């Protein structure tokens, strides 16, 4: 078979040259659009469901929330296994699907199953939430917010309400999760003595706040040919709105929240903390969406963070160098480029030292980009992107390619030289054919082994 391929190539040299040029152009075009990541996707498609039930014990969360969800999703088509974990006030269920399952279809199927068990959850349970689709190695960038003059609550507010929305608007970003700092919240500190004096309970205050914290739609008011929308504005926007909420009327006298409680801004109870070294800070983790290109998304995130930095107060420091996944990819690409350059130099030096012929060196050098782009086309055909493992494999393979090219070119060069010294020289094509066929099987088999 190898002899027939060599013979056909020698008889159709122009076609082979044109095909090689087209092959190189196609490989370069495909290379530009291939996704780049640190590692290939090594985890099967999965859907993560989290359900919050404030105050619920782990045993109750497992029995009343986790188990019903597990039972509902177990029969979903394509499910390989279901894992779960229950903690204080939180249920987490991980539904793992078979390889090849479309993750978006899987999410739709799981969502339909969840709806059938929502009514069975205990009162006060939040609606189940499916976490965003992220890659198995989805951490793109980690940033931190620090300040010598501002409180951790202010830093967390900046992260949650200024940085996070702008980053989520970028294509390829799946989630932005901040840890550390203090989450700002309205706190109503009830006084048992004042509650008893007005014969009220904590539930009365809670219900009053829930009723008042809404904007009520009204009708239309028509006047002078114009329609005006009537809306009851009750949404809480300040501490005074909370203080002035009416809890109850006693003898036609309103009892306000301020009469039975102290109202202030405070920090949510912490579940963990964040720091850079030993300095408290707000640390944000940006994760990329499933299938997104790591380098492209990272560059967009860095541009956005640079723009955000200009809008932050001067006493707030935004550090975007805590972690950068793209560094690993860029390092792998740099190593591959270095391997290409070193391989080309070694081939050139070896061939010039032993053969002293420019044409042989050029032919061997051409084999490097041709083989490399051939590998890129093969990866693309199998749906595999560029990552540290494929780049490492290509870098190692370059050595084999160069070795094979040197052996072939050296043997052809030697046979041509002997043919020129012969009293009855044979046709050049026949000499090249015999020289290449002579070592072809050995080279191919040795390369495969």
PLM features per residue range, with description:
Residues 10-14, 333, 337, 341, ...:
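Internal alpha-helical transmembrane segments of multi-pass membrane proteins, especially GPCRs
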Residues 27-31, 317-318, 345-414:
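Hydrophobic transmembrane alpha-helices and their membrane-interface caps
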Residues 344, 348, 443-448:
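Hydrophobic alpha-helical segments of membrane proteins
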Residues 1-345, 353, 386:
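Membrane-proximal extracytoplasmic
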Residues 16, 85, 222, 364, ...:
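The H+8 position on the N-terminal DHp helix of two-component sensor histidine kinases
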Residues 16, 176, 195, 328, ...:
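Alpha-helical transmembrane segments and their helix-entry boundary regions
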Residues 329, 333-334, 409, 415-445:
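Helix-loop junctions and hydrophobic alpha-helical segments within the transmembrane domains
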Residues 205, 334, 358-361, 387, ...:
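Helix-terminus/capping and membrane-interface signal
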């Amino acid at each position: 078979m190898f002899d027939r391929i060599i013979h056909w190539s020698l008889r159709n040299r122009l076609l082979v040259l044109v095909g090689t040029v087209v092959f190189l152009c196609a490989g370069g075009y495909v290379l530009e659009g291939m996704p780049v990541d640190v590692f290939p996707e090594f985890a099967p498609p999965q859907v993560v469901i989290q359900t919050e039930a404030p105050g619920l014990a782990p045993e109750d969360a497992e029995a009343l929330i986790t188990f019903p969800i597990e039972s509902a999703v177990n029969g979903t088509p394509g499910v390989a296994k279901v894992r779960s974990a229950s903690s204080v006030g939180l249920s987490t269920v991980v539904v793992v699907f078979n390889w090849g399952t479309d993750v978006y279809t899987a999410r739709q199927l799981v969502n339909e199953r969840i709806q059938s068990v929502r009514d069975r959850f205990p009162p006060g349970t939040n609606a189940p939430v499916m976490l965003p689709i992220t890659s198995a190695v989805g951490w793109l960038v980690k940033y931190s917010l620090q300040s010598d003059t501002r409180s951790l609550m202010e830093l967390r507010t900046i992260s949650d309400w200024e940085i996070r929305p702008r980053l989520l608007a970028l294509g390829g970003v799946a989630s932005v999760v901040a840890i550390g700092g203090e989450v700002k919240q309205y706190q109503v500190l009830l006084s048992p003595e004042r509650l008893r004096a007005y014969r009220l309970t904590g539930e009365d205050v809670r219900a009053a706040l829930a009723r008042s914290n809404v904007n009520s739609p009204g009708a239309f008011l028509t006047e002078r040919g114009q329609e005006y929308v009537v809306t009851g504005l009750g949404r809480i926007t300040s501490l005074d709105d909370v203080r002035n909420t009416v809890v109850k009327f006693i003898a036609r006298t309103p009892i306000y929240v301020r009469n039975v409680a102290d109202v202030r801004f405070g920090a949510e109870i912490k579940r963990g903390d964040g720091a850079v070294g030993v300095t408290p800070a707000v640390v944000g983790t940006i994760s990329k969406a499933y299938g997104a290109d790591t380098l492209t998304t990272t560059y967009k995130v860095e541009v956005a963070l640079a723009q955000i930095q200009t809008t932050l107060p001067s006493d707030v420091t935004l550090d975007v160098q805590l972690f950068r996944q793209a560094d690993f990819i860029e390092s792998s690409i740099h190593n591959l480029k270095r391997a290409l350059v070193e391989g080309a130099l070694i081939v050139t030096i070896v061939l010039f030292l032993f053969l002293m012929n420019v044409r042989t060196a050029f032919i061997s050098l051409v084999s490097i980009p041709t083989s490399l782009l051939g590998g890129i086309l093969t990866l693309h055909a199998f749906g595999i992107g560029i990552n540290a493992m494929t780049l490492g494999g290509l870098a190692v393979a370059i050595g084999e390619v160069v070795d094979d090219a040197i052996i072939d070119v050296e043997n052809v060069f030697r046979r041509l030289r002997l043919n020129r010294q012969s009293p009855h020289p044979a046709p050049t094509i026949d000499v090249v054919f015999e020289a290449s066929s002579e070592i072809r099987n050995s080279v191919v088999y040795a390369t495969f082994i």
